Amino acid sequence: MRLWKSMAWGILLWHSQSGALCPAWPPARAAEEIARLQQQLADWNDIYWKQGVSAVDDSVYDQLSARLVQWQRCVGQDVSSTPVSPPLNGTTMHPVAHTGVRKLVDRQAVEQWMRGRSELWVQPKVDGVAVTLVYQNGKLTRAISRGNGLQGEDWTPKIRLIPSIPQTTQGALANAVLQGEIFLQREGHIQQRMGGMNARSKVAGMLMRQDNASALNSLGIFIWAWPDGPANMPERLSQLAKAGFSLTNKYTLAVKDASEVERARQSWLTSALPFVTDGVVIRMAKEPASQHWRPGQGDWLAAWKYPPVAQVAQVSAIQFSVGKSGKITVVASLVPVILDDKRVQRVNIGSVKRWEAWDIAPGDQILVSLAGQGIPRLDEVVWRSRERSKPVPPDSHFNSLTCFYASATCQEQFISRLIWLGSRSALGLDGMGEASWRALHQTHRFEHIFSWLTLTSAQIANTPGFAKGKSEQIWRQFNLARRQPFTRWIMAMDIPLTQAALQASGDRSWEQLLMRTEQHWRQLPATGERRAGRVIDWRNNLQIKALSRWLAAQHIPGFGS
């Protein structure tokens, strides 16, 4: 594991074993943040297992637990004390230990794990609470919570009240130990669409509370292990089904390679199931004798979990952008996370007022998901760093009539105006994105939003970062823009009208536009009194008038005499 490495000024640069970045904290702060997160997880853990109440979403808890382990590894700290398993309240020994399951991160890891292993089967990874069922002489005699894998709580009285769990067995199952998952029964649950629903916490809550016997009717059981059971998997599944554990037989499939595992995984993700799942488990039919089972040592099975629909991401910086209308937007830069195969490294928070209400600072952990069209969305702040160092937002004097001309304070809104005028809604300058505009402005120091019209082909070619092909394309685009109709140039100047309203107005020259009264603008489509007033203010703005004269001097259609 990698240790924090001090630099001369006491700031630490960082990497973790997994390739994820570690926080650039001094040692004292690192120790404090780790201790705070560790205590918070312990508190949530305690509430969850003692009261059956979830103070935080299951997925958030799991991801923050993983984040804690990452931080601990960054500083070379022992991770064995991480509170990711229930506190040991029960003292009932498991006749066979719960091994837990190793997590595989992707298909490549699945292929590697399967290599050299035979007689493999795949099952859905049912999301619930693990339990041991002990049958003696054909009767259910004990039910034990997973606990720490070696011992847990005696849940027998509660388990006897769950109708879906057989109370009697016969044949080979008359004297048997079974391990499985108590889950919340669902009708037609489609995991991809409906998500996890905090199912694990709901099941734990039902089993912990004393006043909800009727709620136990909604619980089911999925048996995933029969220690020392039949070596032949089909025989094992058949006997379980005959005993009343039919789901195991229905949802256990033989697989030969990672492709078949992936097919089953995708099918169960998108199909209607009777339970919530969070991935699949691949297991060998051949298992060691039960006396050799130990927590954390089940190398004959592994899990390939579904990617979470929302990811906990660390805020690395807070940035402000000013749109062409002067609206200030706050953006959180993130340590990159993957959501639905999309690399997410920034999320729009919204207005300064909304950012202040969220109280987000660098170092905070936020929950991010994808909204419509794959746009990252801020869902909640799940953990706040102790240090609340926030940048100061820019002055709020910007509006829809500022920054047509460049200045030190107008940098961001000026760039936003360039991006707008190059869009298809205005002049349609193909290939001109934010990076290109910034490069041109930084190199040639535009005076106003149309200064690029005077650039020569040599000047464009000498712009840093512009290859020959790109320079020639931009030169052609700039020259073609001169032929664009008057209405396109007016849109580029951000007249507060829709394209439909501007077309309906019939104006084809600046002179015509100057003659229009406010009453004329009010009668146009989607243009009421307020917008008509804004058009008059725009037309009378000194910067707009200056730009119209400049465009006339450039012989742009509609601006000359």
Curated annotation (Swiss-Prot):
PROSITE patterns: DNA_LIGASE_N1 (PS01055), DNA_LIGASE_N2 (PS01056)
Lineage: Bacteria, Pseudomonadati, Pseudomonadota, Gammaproteobacteria, Enterobacterales
SUPFAM superfamilies reported in the protein's UniProt record: DNA ligase/mRNA capping enzyme, catalytic domain, Nucleic acid-binding proteins, RuvA domain 2-like
Pfam families documented for this protein: DNA_ligase_aden, DNA_ligase_OB
Catalytic site positions: K125 (n6-amp-lysine intermediate)
Molecular function via GO: DNA ligase (NAD+) activity
PANTHER family: DNA LIGASE, DNA LIGASE B
Keyword presence, Iron: no
HAMAP family the UniProt entry points to: DNA_ligase_B (MF_01587)
Family label: Belongs to the NAD-dependent DNA ligase family. LigB subfamily.
InterPro entries reported in the protein's UniProt record: DNA_ligase_AS (IPR018239), DNA_ligase_B (IPR020923), DNA_ligase_CS (IPR033136), DNAligase_adenylation (IPR013839), DNAligase_N (IPR013840), NA-bd_OB-fold (IPR012340), NAD_dep_DNA_ligaseB (IPR050326), NAD_DNA_ligase_OB (IPR004150)
Protein's name according to its UniProt entry: DNA ligase B
Job of this protein: Catalyzes the formation of phosphodiester linkages between 5'-phosphoryl and 3'-hydroxyl groups in double-stranded DNA using NAD as a coenzyme and as the energy source for the reaction.
Reactions the enzyme catalyzes: NAD(+) + (deoxyribonucleotide)n-3'-hydroxyl + 5'-phospho-(deoxyribonucleotide)m = (deoxyribonucleotide)n+m + AMP + beta-nicotinamide D-nucleotide
The enzyme's E.C. designation: 6.5.1.2
Taxonomy, superkingdom: Bacteria
GO biological process, one term: DNA repair
Matches recorded under SMART domains: LIGANc
Record keywords, A-Z: DNA damage, DNA repair, DNA replication, Ligase, NAD
